[in-house]
Amino acid sequence: MTPTAQTTASARRVVFPFTAIVGQEEMKLALLLNVIDPKIGGVMIMGDRGTGKSTTIRALADLLPEIPVVANDPFNSDPSDPDLMSDEVRQKSGTGAEIPIEFKKVQMVDLPLGATEDRVCGTIDIEKALSEGVKAFEPGLLAKANRGILYVDEVNLLDDHLVDVLLDSAASGWNTVEREGISIRHPARFVLVGSGNPEEGELRPQLLDRFGMHAEIHTVKEPALRVQIVEQRSEFDQNPPTFLEKYNPEQTALQKKIVEAQKLLPEVKLDYDLRVKISEVCSELDVDGLRGDIVTNRAAKALTAYEGRTEVTVDDIRRVITLCLRHRLRKDPLESIDSGYKVEKVFARIFGVELLEDDSSQKNGAGQIKTGVR
């Protein structure tokens, strides 16, 4: 670790370790897959209050390894990938000039509910541009979030036009700011994570569809698990350094697994017949557009890479398809069946597999419980 990174690490607040989080496997899987392949398009997490949504997201950001960035660059430009460089860095790179590099933790940027569009996208100093002839740009939160995680708590309460801006940037990987005929563009490739409580209002279907995955979490009902969660939290609060030390081997192992999955991802193959069946499921469920097909393909590949394999199996698809499709189904007020269960039923029929009892148990918040990611 570099001296700069050590200083930053000591200044950071202590975060509950990701591998110590009990249950909520659906949410954890969705977050991990988005980190392995950000092109999945982010994740929307809807669930009850106090179920560990914010804690898990912050824990994930803290878990991720350091990345190389161009020193003193507000956009966290990648020194080796032109698609993730600001214009200034790309010009320097083109002339063969030496680019100073530093290592820093993956950024976790919180977007407050009261944020303005200028604060999110950045602003252009028109006066300076006209008087001095330079593009004076004040970067916003999207610039800071490049190559990191952008977290919006209570996303269902955020202004619709801001949600649109975020989703456009997340999908394209670029943010464009135009004022008075002056245009500035910079990379903004990030994992968009939104969370909310459905009791406080729903997100519009056309915006919900733009999130790659949708995880539903519920309060853990099993008394033994609740006690375990309370005890772990108490242990962490009493002595954070000792608690972190205890989980350090698991954190390091998971971090290594994520890095290896990112490297393995380009080699993962998804058989044509399986791709056809994924599209059959989407067609049968009357999913609008092709986002559902694309995201399910990407998520299945990311899961396969995470498991250390290069061939996608039916089970890989089964584990991700509900996360990728449940929020894309048309809402029928007279329909009593859960949208996730509906996806599972259609999947089981088209892929010719048995509907697992465990799948429906995911609705109780403890589905497919393991103690942490171990």
UniProtKB/Swiss-Prot annotation:
GO terms for molecular function: ATP binding; ATP hydrolysis activity; magnesium chelatase activity. It catalyses: protoporphyrin IX + Mg(2+) + ATP + H2O = Mg-protoporphyrin IX + ADP + phosphate + 3 H(+). Its EC number is 6.6.1.1. Pathway: Porphyrin-containing compound metabolism; chlorophyll biosynthesis. GO terms for biological process: chlorophyll biosynthetic process; photosynthesis. It holds the Pfam family Mg_chelatase. ATP binds at residues 47-54. Keywords: ATP-binding, Chlorophyll biosynthesis, Ligase, Nucleotide-binding, Photosynthesis. It is an enzyme of class 6 (ligase). InterPro entries: AAA+_ATPase (IPR003593), CHLI-like (IPR045006), ChlI/MoxR_AAA_lid (IPR041628), Mg_chelatase_ATPase-isu (IPR011775), Mg_chelatse_chII-like_cat_dom (IPR000523), P-loop_NTPase (IPR027417). Belongs to the Mg-chelatase subunits D/I family. Involved in chlorophyll biosynthesis; introduces a magnesium ion into protoporphyrin IX to yield Mg-protoporphyrin IX. This is Magnesium-chelatase subunit ChlI. It comes from Nostoc sp. (strain PCC 7120 / SAG 25.82 / UTEX 2576).
